[in-house]
């Protein structure tokens, strides 16, 4: 495995040394988008991994990498489908085309990528959501052979995650339809949220999203969380609730442990919860201590021992990357500056490095200079002169995040979330961006030369 990861790094470096020049991350106005370049503001090398406009990497906690680390999957457009990137050669191959499919994730054990198939309605693409009241077919496609098999059909709702031994899928459905979005999506962006203030003025994208989410939360639509047996398609309900169940993630270590969220405006909900496939009493992971405190965009460490999340005390004022250790109960809060807040955070597989994808001035941090891809080191705040409080081990452990800017995202429109992920070897960050106009998938090298 180490040899494979090393070969990926060497190949990426050799391609960029031969082809890269210092260029700006600016819209190309009809010109060809460069295959590789050095960001003039950070000195880090960037590679465009995708070949086709409209290509996207997956959501930040959805696995896009084969277990062996040699390939990753992305979505492609025109025609809509799935492509595979060989991380040894950087060759991109279309794997499966269909206008009605979407990518869920790579299997953690097999060489299969899991897809959804949802028929279009009146010529419009139907996006997976918990409130969907029509069937979704789940397919598995082998990334080497292209062999396709049907896994299951769910009558309604959405599949969210797959467990680490690849025996179960998990999803949720609401008992009535509701659409957060107000019309067809612009392909350059993430979603379409529109709302007006009390005077009838259009709200910003970020504020409109809050309004639309609050409308959905207050409907208190009955929901169910369910598992799907990958071998035989059997479905089993594990949780019923009128809370808005969302962001469901199996533990990467325990095939029965499940993290999920109570969705809605973060300051109104206790968001992060644990349960299991047997429906054990849910455990709340973070308790609010002040009004307007928010926590969310939670994700697992790769060893499954910790849960990480964006914490703000209060919202939009003080920013932390927090974690909770399931084995020891230890909590760590890592402080960051306003401009370093990111839409999503992620971590390397060895747990040594963190990354963030930045944000624009309309988002919660109201950052003045936040449009960057960041690398973070966590630096603990140590006791003074080695003197500890008697109950130090029972207290939250403070730390700070030391940031390094990797990519200037000034020309990126954050209505498309970059969704950064570390490559399995920990040497690159993969993200999606519309910085040059069309959406493409890019990788930035963490090492600086």
Where are these regions (language model features)?
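Blade/loop signatures of beta-propeller domains
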Residues: 24-47, 214-226, 388-397
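Beta-strand-rich domains and repeat architectures in extracellular enzymes and scaffolds
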Residues: 25-36, 45-80, 248
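Conserved beta-propeller blade repeats
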Residues: 55-73, 98-119, 155-174, 202, ...
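Structural motif
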Residues: 80-84, 121-139, 178-184, 220-226, ...
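Short loop/turn segments that connect beta-strands within beta-propeller blades
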Residues: 86-90, 142-146, 229-233, 276-280, ...
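Asp-box/WD-like beta-propeller blade repeats and closely related beta-sheet repeat scaffolds
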Residues: 100-101, 107, 116-223, 237-240
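Loop/turn-rich, solvent-exposed surfaces of beta-rich toroidal or solenoidal domains
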Residues: 305-320, 335-402
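Blade-level signature of beta-propeller repeat domains, shared across WD40, Kelch, NHL, RCC1
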Residues: 416-449
């Amino acid at each position: 495995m180490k040899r494979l990861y090393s070969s990926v790094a060497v190949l990426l470096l050799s391609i960029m040394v031969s082809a890269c020049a210092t260029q700006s991350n600016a819209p190309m106005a009809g010109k060809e988008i460069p295959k590789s370049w050095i960001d003039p503001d950070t000195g880090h090398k960037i590679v465009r991994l995708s070949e086709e406009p409209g290509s996207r990497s997956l959501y930040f906690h959805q696995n896009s990498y084969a277990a062996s680390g040699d390939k990753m999957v992305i979505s492609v457009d025109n025609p809509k489908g799935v492509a595979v990137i060989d991380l040894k050669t950087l060759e991109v191959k279309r794997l499966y085309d269909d206008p009605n499919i979407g990518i869920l994730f790579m299997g953690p054990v097999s060489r299969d990528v899991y897809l959804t198939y949802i028929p279009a309605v009146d010529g419009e693409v139907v996006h997976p959501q918990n409130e969907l009241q029509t069937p979704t077919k789940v397919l598995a496609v082998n990334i080497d052979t292209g062999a396709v098999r049907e896994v299951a059909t769910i009558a309604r709702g959405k599949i969210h995650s797959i467990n680490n031994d690849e025996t179960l899928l998990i999803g949720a459905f609401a008992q009535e339809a509701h659409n957060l979005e107000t019309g067809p999506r612009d392909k350059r962006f993430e979603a379409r949220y529109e709302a007006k203030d009390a005077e009838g003025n259009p709200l910003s994208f970020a504020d409109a999203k809050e309004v639309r989410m609050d409308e959905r939360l207050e409907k208190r639509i009955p929901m169910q969380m369910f598992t799907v047996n990958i071998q035989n398609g059997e479905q089993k309900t594990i949780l019923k609730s009128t809370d808005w169940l969302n962001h469901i993630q199996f533990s990467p270590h325990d095939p029965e442990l499940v993290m999920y969220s109570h969705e809605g405006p973060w300051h109104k909900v206790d968001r992060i919860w644990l349960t299991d496939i047997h429906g054990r009493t849910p455990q709340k992971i973070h308790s609010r201590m002040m009004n307007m405190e928010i926590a969310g965009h939670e994700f697992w460490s790769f060893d499954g021992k910790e849960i990480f999340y964006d914490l703000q005390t209060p919202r939009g004022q003080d920013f932390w990357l927090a974690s909770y250790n399931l084995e020891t109960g230890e909590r760590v809060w890592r402080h960051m500056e306003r401009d370093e807040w990111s839409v999503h955070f992620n971590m390397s597989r060895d747990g040594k490095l963190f990354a963030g994808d930045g944000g624009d001035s309309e988002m919660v941090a109201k950052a003045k200079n936040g449009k960057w891809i960041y690398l973070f080191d966590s630096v603990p705040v140590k006791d003074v002169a080695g003197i500890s409080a008697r109950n130090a081990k029972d207290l939250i452990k403070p730390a700070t995040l030391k940031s390094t800017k990797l990519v200037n995202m000034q020309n990126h429109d954050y209505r498309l979330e970059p969704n950064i992920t570390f490559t399995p070897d920990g040497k690159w960050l993969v993200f999606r961006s519309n910085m040059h106009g069309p959406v493409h998938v890019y990788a930035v090298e963490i090492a600086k030369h």
